[in-house]
Amino acid sequence: MNPSTAQARVVVDELVRGGVHDVVLCPGSRNAPLAFALADADRAGRLRLHVRIDERTAGFLAIGLAVADRAPVCVAMTSGTAVANLGPAVVEANYARVPLIVLSANRPYELLGTGANQTFEQLGYFGNQVRANISLGLAPELSSGSPGDMTSLNAQWRSATCRVVVAATGSRSANAGPVQFDIPLREPLVPTFDDDGSCPPGRPDGKPWTHTPPVTFDQPLDIDLTPDTVVIAGHGAGVHPNLADLPTVAEPTAPPAANPLHPMALRLLRPKQVIMLGRPTLHRPVSALLADPSVPVYALTTGPRWPDVSGNSQATGTRAVTSGTPDPAWLRRCKEVNDHAVAAVREQLAAHPLTTGLHVAAAVADAVRPGDQLVLGASNPVRDAALVGFTPHGVQVRSNRGVAGIDGTVSTAIGAALAHDRTGGRTIALMGDLTFVHDSSGLLIGPTEPTPRNLTIVVSNDNGGGIFELLEQGDPRFSDVSSRVFGTPHDVDVGALCRAYHVDNRQIEVGQLADALDEPHEGMRVLEVKADRSSLRALHASIKAAL
């Protein structure tokens, strides 16, 4: 067995032992030893392999798999720009705390700076965006007469791989995230003719080489619930049963609120204190409340990042130790304004003469059912889902809220669907046309690759960036330039784009969406709904006026 083959087999075996169920592989020559080892593990049913030609989309596919499966996922690629293309996914995984392992093959390090082809200083390329940069080191030449050497190397390689998995999952830090695992591989890069497929042994019973129980990060915080309190539940909020009775503005990716409070209803209330869970990222009324110096804020998070954008948090912790009882009159008032806000949104939607992205989001929100998985694009869709009063009981909601970019959303949805398929449930993804077009190459799934069994991508197509209609850039005084430089119309034929990738698709009206989503289907499909963005500003103004 040549050194690179031995090293790759040990790494793959130990990754599986460490809990890796899925690996995304991008083709290349330098990562051939890893490719052979991964293909062997896939054939043996030890992991599921996904081959992609684009490293950028591969990274987001891995994010979708990791988030939905709650397990570390690897992306393996060759050296050079292949590694650099993981940049956006690594940044998202960092801030969303997703266990993404970048398994980067490299040339032998002595070739750095010599002009060697497809070679750059890739170890450490991601800087402080990763939890760790770990190099396995170049495997030495192996002597058939020195079994002791292989025993020592096997232990070193397995220990290093365990270190990678532990860093990615946050077992010792309570801070999951991306890790770069850089492996320089010497030639020969393919197994020898007489190779018997063996692998140096790991621990008995399939256990990891180094067992690392997860740490518990626990910081209780005393909070009196007697003052009029609202809860703001953002991305990564976690479950807090002792706060369930409180009125809660829950973002779609947070656990569903038992006592929901519409984000636009905050303007009608005067809370005396706020409990913030996770990391809010969506609503301006929420940001304004959290920044109000007259309102104490208690921040409860599950990780080490500082949870205080406005600098207004009075105390931080991981869970509340509560005392006191909420005022029943306050709870009634919050329920009344929530019901009023939800009704106002729905009434204005019904009265509006044109179909907008908000109408599409309402139709999707009304169509999902328990057991579903809903993937929401950044920009308007995730906000629209909150505005229409969506409360996702029994629904798993995903959205890339780490740094909230639109890139990689198609691939994230496909990865999430592939993981959710194990439950037998369906996945619905809602995204805008720019988000869809930006990651349309994510639709490219080879004929031999695992494909989602039940994924519907709903594209709300208003031919550009509708969110800018609602921001300062959409002010009518900028109309002479805003459509071009912010709205960015593209005139892409979504149906033709889908057909190029052999993806079933059709264009429907928003009123047909509920029936279309309810009809049985197999595989992956795209439903396109034409929408208007020119009237979004007026629609949102009418909703605010109705409140």
UniProtKB/Swiss-Prot annotation:
EC primary class: transferase
Details of cofactor binding: Binds 1 thiamine pyrophosphate per subunit.
Top-level taxonomic group: Bacteria
GO BP: menaquinone biosynthetic process
Coiled-coil stretches: none
UniProt cofactor(s): Mg(2+); Mn(2+); thiamine diphosphate
EC number: 2.2.1.9
SUPFAM superfamilies: Thiamin diphosphate-binding fold (THDP-binding)
Keywords, in A-Z order: Magnesium, Manganese, Menaquinone biosynthesis, Metal-binding, Thiamine pyrophosphate, Transferase
Gene Ontology MF terms in the entry: 2-succinyl-5-enolpyruvyl-6-hydroxy-3-cyclohexene-1-carboxylic-acid synthase activity; magnesium ion binding; manganese ion binding; thiamine pyrophosphate binding
Family annotation (PANTHER family): 2-SUCCINYL-5-ENOLPYRUVYL-6-HYDROXY-3-CYCLOHEXENE-1-CARBOXYLATE SYNTHASE (PTHR42916), PROTEIN PHYLLO, CHLOROPLASTIC (PTHR42916:SF1)
Function: Catalyzes the thiamine diphosphate-dependent decarboxylation of 2-oxoglutarate and the subsequent addition of the resulting succinic semialdehyde-thiamine pyrophosphate anion to isochorismate to yield 2-succinyl-5-enolpyruvyl-6-hydroxy-3-cyclohexene-1-carboxylate (SEPHCHC).
HAMAP family per record: MenD (MF_01659)
Family in the record: Belongs to the TPP enzyme family. MenD subfamily.
Quaternary state and interactors: Homodimer.
NCBIfam families: menD
Protein name as annotated: 2-succinyl-5-enolpyruvyl-6-hydroxy-3-cyclohexene-1-carboxylate synthase
